[in-house]
């Protein structure tokens, strides 16, 4: 029997404007195109991927809560909520699902208020500064992590 991993991709505030908002920082590709490419990659890896984007913190929290028992792994770009949301952190601690934090830009070379993340210390890993390729890297790492976990 082949296991199909269930990975949830979550994108936070303003990422719906990817390709429009400060493209010199975040890139020129629309979120819909990024997600479409990730769906193709996930299919090639035998992964069932779902995607959710919201500008509202409470909707992201609800999405994380609903992932309990429905997702094996989460990839999240929390965007600005990275630096402000204790509630997102608590949501992850509540469901106990491994996750990778992704940022399109390198948050450590930008404004000082972006240096701190409320999620990094509880994430399996953090990928930042590689644009949309960071999502692909996270997807491959999630697959590798889940494959190792299932083979133990």
Curated annotation (Swiss-Prot):
Homododecamer. The active site is at residues 26, 103. The lineage of its organism: Bacteria, Pseudomonadati, Pseudomonadota, Gammaproteobacteria, Enterobacterales. GO terms for biological process: amino acid biosynthetic process; aromatic amino acid family biosynthetic process; chorismate biosynthetic process; quinate catabolic process. It is an enzyme of class 4 (lyase). Belongs to the type-II 3-dehydroquinase family. This is 3-dehydroquinate dehydratase. One of its GO terms (molecular function) is 3-dehydroquinate dehydratase activity. Pathway: Metabolic intermediate biosynthesis; chorismate biosynthesis; chorismate from D-erythrose 4-phosphate and phosphoenolpyruvate: step 3/7. Substrate binds at residues 77, 83, 90, 104-105, 114. Catalyzes a trans-dehydration via an enolate intermediate. The keyword DNA-binding does not apply. The keyword Lyase applies. It comes from the Bacteria. Keywords: Amino-acid biosynthesis, Aromatic amino acid biosynthesis, Lyase. The record marks 21 as: Transition state stabilizer. It comes from Blochmanniella pennsylvanica (strain BPEN). It catalyses: 3-dehydroquinate = 3-dehydroshikimate + H2O. Its EC number is 4.2.1.10. InterPro entries: DHquinase_II (IPR001874), DHquinase_II_CS (IPR018509), DHquinase_II_sf (IPR036441).
């Amino acid at each position: 029997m082949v296991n199909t991993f269930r990975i949830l991709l979550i994108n936070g505030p303003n990422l719906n404007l990817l390709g429009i908002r400060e493209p010199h920082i975040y890139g020129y590709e629309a979120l819909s195109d990024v997600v479409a490419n990730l769906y193709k990659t996930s299919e090639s890896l035998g992964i069932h991927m779902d995607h959710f984007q919201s500008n509202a913190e409470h909707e992201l929290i609800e999405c994380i809560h609903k992932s309990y028992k429905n997702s094996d792994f989460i990839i999240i770009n929390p965007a600005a909520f990275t630096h402000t949301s204790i509630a997102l952190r608590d949501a992850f601690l509540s469901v106990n699902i491994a996750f990778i934090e992704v940022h399109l830009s390198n948050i450590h070379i930008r404004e000082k208020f972006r240096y701190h993340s409320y999620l990094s210390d509880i994430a399996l890993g953090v990928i930042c500064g590689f644009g949309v390729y960071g999502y692909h890297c996270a997807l491959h790492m999630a697959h590798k992590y889940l494959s190792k976990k299932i083979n133990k």
